[in-house]
């Protein structure tokens, strides 16, 4: 089949780089447009791409992107992404948005972020967690790529929704590498702040809390109480979730996981506690769970930049274009 032309707007960040790395290995997608807030050569932004990719990075322009591309990945901050998405969609381009702009209801979005400027497309967007919405993604023109914490948390809890006390809810203790804070420098991401340190941040009030609750409640068909606390670890990449809930019936957790995810290529059910090392650099989500005295512990691990962002975006684009969803998804971990 002929190559499908794709573009990235917001290419200069970590997720932009990961998209490039994956697209270079994609058999059907051809990078035809790269854009950021200013013009440059791609190897000036990422010197590791010298001799690998010779493309100019343009100042972002939706009309120019639409001329060159059938699919555009938006790796932009919230609010900025929706401005481009609205234009691209009106020009017939499929959009995978890695920001938060289309993940929530209008009410929850405006509670956590800002006024929504594209309510019409917000109502049409499909939440791009493949294991949850595979068939809907196939027919979508706009996919909202899930956040990293919600990806790891929802995939962990989803199989157990009919077995846990929804009123008591679920407590989610999540930990991320520093790359989750993005490329822009802040006081909390300085080496001296992160090294030999670990801390909770934005406990209870993190923006991803409502994304997790919203999509778990939709999946359960009933409101579920959630308590979400993220932590920062002194590692570059990776994410670990520990979730706790009260059971309403006796189950064998590994059997539940195995049955629920039996057809999912990139979900690995483990019989021991999961490790970031085994998933870093891959699209895999490793999950395990243990029951004890009427309670359950669920443990998941992902790569926050890949399964939590860029490789998930590739999987969504694959489905949107009628391709094998697993094309170009990384499988070998960066173990050392």
Swiss-Prot record:
Its main location: cytoplasm. The keyword Chaperone does not apply. Its EC number is 1.2.1.38. One of its GO terms (molecular function) is NAD binding. It comes from Campylobacter curvus (strain 525.92). It comes from the Bacteria. It catalyses: N-acetyl-L-glutamate 5-semialdehyde + phosphate + NADP(+) = N-acetyl-L-glutamyl 5-phosphate + NADPH + H(+). SMART domains: Semialdhyde_dh. Catalyzes the NADPH-dependent reduction of N-acetyl-5-glutamyl phosphate to yield N-acetyl-L-glutamate 5-semialdehyde. One of its GO terms (biological process) is L-arginine biosynthetic process. The keyword Thylakoid does not apply. This is N-acetyl-gamma-glutamyl-phosphate reductase.
């Amino acid at each position: 089949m002929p190559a499908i032309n794709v573009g990235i707007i917001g290419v200069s960040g970590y997720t932009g780089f990961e998209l490039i790395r994956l697209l270079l290995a994609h058999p059907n997608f051809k990078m035809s447009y790269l854009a950021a807030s200013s013009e440059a050569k791609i190897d000036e932004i990422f010197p590791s791409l010298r001799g690998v990719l010779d493309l100019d990075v343009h100042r972002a322009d939706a009309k120019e992107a639409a001329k060159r591309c059938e699919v555009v990945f938006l790796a932009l901050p919230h609010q900025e992404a929706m401005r481009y998405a609205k234009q691209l969609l009106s020009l017939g381009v499929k959009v995978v948005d890695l920001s938060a702009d289309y993940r929530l209801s209008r009410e929850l979005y405006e509670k956590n972020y800002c006024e929504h400027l594209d309510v019409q497309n917000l109502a049409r967007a499909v939440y791009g967690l493949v294991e949850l919405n595979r068939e809907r993604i196939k027919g979508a023109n706009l996919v909202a790529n899930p956040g990293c914490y919600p990806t790891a948390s929802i995939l962990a809890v989803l199989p157990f929704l009919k077995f846990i006390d929804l009123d008591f809810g679920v407590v989610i203790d999540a930990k991320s590498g520093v790359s989750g804070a993005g490329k822009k420098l802040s006081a909390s991401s300085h080496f001296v702040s992160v090294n030999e340190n670990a801390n909770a941040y934005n406990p209870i009030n993190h923006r991803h809390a409502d994304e997790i609750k919203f999509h778990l409640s939709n999946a359960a068909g009933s409101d579920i109480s959630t308590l979400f606390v993220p932590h920062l670890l002194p590692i570059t990449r990776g994410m670990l979730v520990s979730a706790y809930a009260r059971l309403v019936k006796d189950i064998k957790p590994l059997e539940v996981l195995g049955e629920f995810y039996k057809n999912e290529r990139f979900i690995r059910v483990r019989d021991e506690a999961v490790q970031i090392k085994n998933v870093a650099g891959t699209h895999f989500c490793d999950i395990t769970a243990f029951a004890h005295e009427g309670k359950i512990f669920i443990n998941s691990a992902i790569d926050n930049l890949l399964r939590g962002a860029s490789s998930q975006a590739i999987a969504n684009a694959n489905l949107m274009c009628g391709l094998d969803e697993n094309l170009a998804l990384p499988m070998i971990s960066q173990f050392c």
